[in-house]
């Protein structure tokens, strides 16, 4: 199937699954409005890539079909993400006295600062989600942003939110494969990615495309999901944690930090900053919203968010969705999605506690001025 045929098929399926006007619906309201047959198909498309096998053959199968796996993943989890997390699909560090939304915005602004994004810059957001970080960074810097995404549903939502918050003149969102970008070479002043390039089957592939479209002298800043130097691929417990993260987060293979850093160098980048922001011995761990530890909640406004994302909140949601699915209110497959997300949460927390995994390894890399 050609690239254009794949895009057309995905667009048609997205319309069938989510329906008209889906961009304005969020959370469980959006979930309950799905076409039931299409939802079942979407879940099957995603879960067929994860059958409990961690051998190389199963891994290679996921790597080969990364585009469809990622598209299917975000078709089925976007509503759950918005319900539990908001419109910025990433983790962050937390400081004492800082509420959840402030921490998320600061995390995004810090990346923009490290990338040197300034007013008037044309910036590419690789794997933009529903545009939460793009809106924050555009307001923070005054730059103009193009968001790249392979999921039609998320693009619809990102455009809807940009217009809703009167930012449509500062940003646009386009469909594309980050392993095969269609932008002109040397187009962007800066590029950033927030917990998105981990979906790539090969990091040199996505980093090479970023290098191509970035202007000489331009900067690429990324929060990368990687397994740390403590991770041992031959350790069964370590591999189980990595697999739980892969299954619940639509990732064909979790790479190590050394692989990521070398991939940047291999495509021509000069790596200026290489730092794990999760390894700062913070009093409040980055994974606290998933743990159920109320002692870390910083404000009254965080209570609802924390409950939805905590262990007990996730169990409540799973139970509620299970009942709705049984009585025919929620589409078939919804419970399987919540189960996959629960597996991911367990793996993320365990990986974080044992310092095997980080969702915020910061790389700041420069394309040489004399790059051709």
Curated annotation (Swiss-Prot):
Residues 1-23 have a biased composition (Basic and acidic residues). GO terms for biological process: cellular response to xenobiotic stimulus; ergosterol biosynthetic process; methylation; plasma membrane raft polarization. It comes from the Eukaryota. It catalyses: zymosterol + S-adenosyl-L-methionine = fecosterol + S-adenosyl-L-homocysteine + H(+). Keywords: Lipid biosynthesis, Lipid metabolism, Methyltransferase, S-adenosyl-L-methionine, Steroid biosynthesis, Steroid metabolism, Sterol biosynthesis, Sterol metabolism, Transferase. Gene3D superfamilies: Vaccinia Virus protein VP39 (3.40.50.150). The keyword Cytoplasm does not apply. InterPro entries: Erg6_SMT_methyltransf, Methyltransf_11, MeTrfase_SMT, SAM-dependent_MTases_sf, Sterol_MeTrfase_C. Its EC number is 2.1.1.41. Residues 1-28 are annotated as: Disordered. Pathway: Steroid metabolism; ergosterol biosynthesis; ergosterol from zymosterol: step 1/5. The keyword Hydrolase does not apply. Pfam families: Methyltransf_11 (PF08241), Sterol_MT_C (PF08498). One of its GO terms (cellular component) is lipid droplet. GO terms for molecular function: identical protein binding; sterol 24-C-methyltransferase activity. PANTHER family: HYPOTHETICAL LOC100005854 (PTHR44068:SF1), ZGC:194242 (PTHR44068). Belongs to the class I-like SAM-binding methyltransferase superfamily. Erg6/SMT family. This is Sterol 24-C-methyltransferase. It comes from Candida glabrata (strain ATCC 2001 / BCRC 20586 / JCM 3761 / NBRC 0622 / NRRL Y-65 / CBS 138) (Yeast).
């Amino acid at each position: 199937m050609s690239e254009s045929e794949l895009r057309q098929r995905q667009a048609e399926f997205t319309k069938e699954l989510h329906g008209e006007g889906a961009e304005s619906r969020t959370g469980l309201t959006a979930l309950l409005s799905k076409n039931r047959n299409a939802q079942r198909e979407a879940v099957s498309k995603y879960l067929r890539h994860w059958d409990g096998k961690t051998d190389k053959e199963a891994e290679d199968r996921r790597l080969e079909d990364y585009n469809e796996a990622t598209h299917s993943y975000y078709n089925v989890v976007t509503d759950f993400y918005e319900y539990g997390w908001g419109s910025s699909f990433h983790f962050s560090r937390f400081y004492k006295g800082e509420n959840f939304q402030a921490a998320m915005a600061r995390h995004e602004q810090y990346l923009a600062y490290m990338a040197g994004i300034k007013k008037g810059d044309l910036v590419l957001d690789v794997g933009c989600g529903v545009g939460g970080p793009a809106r924050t960074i555009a307001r923070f810097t005054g730059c103009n942003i193009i968001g790249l995404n392979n999921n039609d549903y998320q693009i619809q939502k990102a455009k809807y939110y940009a217009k809703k918050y009167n930012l449509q003149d500062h940003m646009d969102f386009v469909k594309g494969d980050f392993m095969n970008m269609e932008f002109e070479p040397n187009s962007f002043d800066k590029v950033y990615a927030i917990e998105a390039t981990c979906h790539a089957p090969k990091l040199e592939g996505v980093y090479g495309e970023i290098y191509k479209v970035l202007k000489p002298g331009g900067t690429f800043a990324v929060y990368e999901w990687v397994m740390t130097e403590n991770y041992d691929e031959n350790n069964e417990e370590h591999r189980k944690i990595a697999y739980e993260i892969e299954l619940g987060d639509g990732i064909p293979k979790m790479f190590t930090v050394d692989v990521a850093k070398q991939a940047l160098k291999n495509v021509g980048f000069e790596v200026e900053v290489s730092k794990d922001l999760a390894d700062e011995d913070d009093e409040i761990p980055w994974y606290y919203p998933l743990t159920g530890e109320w002692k870390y909640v910083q404000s009254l406004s965080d209570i609802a968010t924390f409950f939805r994302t905590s262990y007990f909140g996730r169990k409540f949601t799973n139970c509620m969705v299970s009942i709705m699915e049984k009585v025919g209110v929620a589409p078939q497959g919804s419970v399987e999605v919540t189960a996959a997300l629960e597996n991911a949460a367990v793996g993320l927390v365990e990986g974080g506690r044992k310092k095997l995994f980080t969702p915020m390894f910061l790389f700041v890399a420069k394309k040489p001025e004399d790059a051709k």
